[in-house]
């Protein structure tokens, strides 16, 4: 931003200088020169030519002056830029200065860190120290605790080894048990199949036995029906025989009755020639 302001200021100065230059150059233009060309107003005399040359030289020196002024103006912005850069470098230098103290501080903490280590060594648990009048010796306790922890770790390691050793036979036994269980299950399955086959055979035998029983049971009612029919036929025959016997007995009774009547009729007929017929009783 500082550089931009310096550039704008330099442009303003250059603009302010250029109008002055234009004013300075305007008299030469009023003498008949425009844009570096000489205007001749009809004077072809050598004196006029010499005057024109002088004017040309004077006007020619004016661009040199202008170029010098422009160079001075450009040098001023350059100087301003350099000043701005110097200002920017000056804040950078304090930053560097700040960084350098930081680095120095970073270097100094190493020494300070060394001093706390020394303090820690002073207050380390390895050495006995007094706190409010009581002395605590951590060496023996730490040694005892370390020995106990080492003993516990060793015991744990031994226990782990024993457990691993016991787990290996258990695993082997478990595998053997699994194999035995599989064999037992296979044997049980075989026994179940055999029992099923035996049950099927027994069921077939029972069905075979039940079939003749059913046949005999069916034949028995048929025989009973036949016997009943025979009994009915016999009863009918007996009834018919009884009826015939009764009819025969009636005929026999009627026949003896007719015989006396016939005998009686014959008797009168026989006696009629001999005498009068006796009245019938």
UniProtKB/Swiss-Prot annotation:
The lineage of its organism: Eukaryota, Metazoa, Chordata, Craniata, Vertebrata. InterPro entries: MARCKS. Residues 117-129 have a biased composition (Basic residues). PANTHER family: MYRISTOYLATED ALANINE-RICH C-KINASE SUBSTRATE (PTHR14353:SF9), MYRISTOYLATED ALANINE-RICH C-KINASE SUBSTRATE MARCKS (PTHR14353). It comes from the Eukaryota. Its main location: cytoplasm. It is found in: Cytoplasm, Cytoskeleton; Membrane. It comes from Gallus gallus. It is a lipid-anchor. Belongs to the MARCKS family. This is Myristoylated alanine-rich C-kinase substrate. A lipid is attached at residue 2 (N-myristoyl glycine). The keyword Lipoprotein applies. Residues 117-141 are annotated as: Calmodulin-binding (PSD). GO terms for cellular component: actin filament bundle; cytoplasm; plasma membrane. Residues 1-281 are annotated as: Disordered. Signal peptide: none annotated.
């Amino acid at each position: 931003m500082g550089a931009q302001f310096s550039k704008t200021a330099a442009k303003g100065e250059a603009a302010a200088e250029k109008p002055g230059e234009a004013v300075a150059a305007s008299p030469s233009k009023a003498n008949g020169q425009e844009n570096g060309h000489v205007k001749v107003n009809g004077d072809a005399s050598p004196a006029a030519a010499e005057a024109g040359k002088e004017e040309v030289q004077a006007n020619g020196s004016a661009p040199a002056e202008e170029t010098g002024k422009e160079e001075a103006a450009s040098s001023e912005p350059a100087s301003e830029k350099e000043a701005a850069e110097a200002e920017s470098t000056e804040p950078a230098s304090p930053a560097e200065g700040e960084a350098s103290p930081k680095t120095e501080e970073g270097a100094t903490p190493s020494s300070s860190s060394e001093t706390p280590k020394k303090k820690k060594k002073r207050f380390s648990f390895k050495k006995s120290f007094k706190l409010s009048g009581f002395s605590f010796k951590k060496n023996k306790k730490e040694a005892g605790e370390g020995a106990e922890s080492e003993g516990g770790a060793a015991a744990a390691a031994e226990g782990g080894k024993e457990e691993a050793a016991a787990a290996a036979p258990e695993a082997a036994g478990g595998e053997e048990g699994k194999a035995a269980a599989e064999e037992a299950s296979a044997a049980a399955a075989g026994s179940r199949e055999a029992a099923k086959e035996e049950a099927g055979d027994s069921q077939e035998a029972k069905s075979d036995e039940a079939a003749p029983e059913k046949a005999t049971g069916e034949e028995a009612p048929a025989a009973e029906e036949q016997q009943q029919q025979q009994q009915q036929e016999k009863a009918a025959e007996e009834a018919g025989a009884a009826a015939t016997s009764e009819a025969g007995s009636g005929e026999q009774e009627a026949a003896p009755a007719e015989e006396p009547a016939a005998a009686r009729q014959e008797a009168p007929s026989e006696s009629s020639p001999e005498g009068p017929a006796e009245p019938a009783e």
